[in-house]
Amino acid sequence: MTIKSDKWIRRMAASHNMIEPFAPDQVRVSEDGRKIVSYGTSSYGYDIRCADEFKIFTNINSTIVDPKNFDEKSFVDFKGDVCIIPPNSFALARTVEYFRIPRSVLTVCLGKSTYARCGIIVNVTPFEPEWEGHVTLEFSNTTPLPAKIYANEGVAQVLFFESDEICETSYADRGGKYQGQHGVTLPKT
């Protein structure tokens, strides 16, 4: 597998709608002139943005977290430009971008250092061959203080790896449960 460059990312976004909406270069300043956490195409990856839809974890209903039988009451829905994650808690969000991953490609996503240096960890599982949808983002606040997440700004970087051989069965072929997801998607079994 080889990592793909900015040229390949731009070409695939233009010819295959791999990323929509797409920023062909790094964006570091908002349209109104404010400094922001960067997003867009980088040398060997794409910095994704967080949309303004969040699900903030709460223990108000005193449920047990069970990935096989997840209780939606474990989250409080929030929409806004800034999400405050309580100390030692987490939140879910989704990307602004919608992805269509080619059959020969697998991605790995890593949190941006701007957030990591503040104790905020971004977790995203790989985007598998022929998966498509908005990406559900997991933010963990590892600090004893409330932490801010900024909507419509960069939060993580996606690295694209292309195999020298096409996979036998893609995510779409096996009817993956998160195929075509829109919005913040909770666990499914």
From Swiss-Prot:
What does the function comment of this entry state? Catalyzes the deamination of dCTP to dUTP.
Q: Under which main EC class is this enzyme filed?
A: hydrolase
Q: What is this protein called?
A: dCTP deaminase
Residues the entry annotates as binding dCTP: K112, S113, T114, Y115, A116, R117, T136, L137, E138, Q157, Y171, Q181
NCBIfam families linked to this entry = dCTP_deam
The cross-references to SUPFAM superfamilies, in alphabetical order and at most eight, read: dUTPase-like (SSF51283)
Q: Which gene encodes it?
A: dcd
Q: What family is it from?
A: Belongs to the dCTP deaminase family.
The pathway this protein participates in, as annotated, is: Pyrimidine metabolism; dUMP biosynthesis; dUMP from dCTP (dUTP route): step 1/2
Catalytic residues, chain numbering: E138 (proton donor/acceptor)
Per the record, the coiled-coil ranges are none
Q: Which reaction is the catalytic activity of this chain?
A: dCTP + H2O + H(+) = dUTP + NH4(+)
